[in-house]
Amino acid sequence: MTLVVSSLSALDLKLSKKMNDEKFVKLSGSGIIAELKKARIQVVAALPDIVTSDGLLWPISKNSDFRLIRVCKEDEGVSICAALSYTGTRALLLMQQTGLLDSLNSIRAIAMEYQQPVCMMIGLQGKNPAEKIADAENYSVRIVKPILQLMGLKTVIIENEKDISKIAASISYAYEFEQPVCFLLGSPPKADGDEYD
C-alpha cells in the first residue's frame, strides 16, 4: 500500500512541476460570457460539470441576460438548441467531453445531417492546462478533436484570451450558415475574483 501512495505522490509532484515549469493561461469566464452576449446567445442548456461550473455555469445562472435550461442528458440539449433556432432564439449547449462523446448520435443526426446551428462549448475534464489537446494524457480528451474533425464539425480551440475573441463570430457563422460549431476549452474558465499565478 505504501508503494501506491508514494507513486501517487510522485505523480502529483511531476504534474505540479510540469504546470509550474510551463506557462499556461486560465481563461476568463467573464470574457467568454461577454462574447456569448455579443453573439446574442439568450439560452444556455447545461449539465453541471467540474470544468465550467465555477467560471461559466454559475455566473450564467445568475445573469438575467441568459435563461438557463438544466438538462438531464447532453443529447437533450442538442435537441433543445436546434429547436430554439426555429424561434429565432440563439442557444449554447455547455457540457464536458464525456457528455459530448455520449451525444455523438444526436449531434450527427440533428446538427450535422439536418444542418442545425447547434453551438456547443466543451470543458475538457482531465486535461492539464499546460498540455496540448492532441498530447493530453487523458484518452477522452485526446480523441475529441479528431472525432469532431472526422464528422466535419467546425471546431474552435479556446486556449487563451486571444482565442476568446473568436467565439461571437463563430456563433454568428453557425446561425448564418445553419451549421453546428464546437468550442473546446483548453483550461477551466476562472470566475471573477479568482486569482491564478
Language-model region placement:
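Thiamine diphosphate
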Residues: 11-197
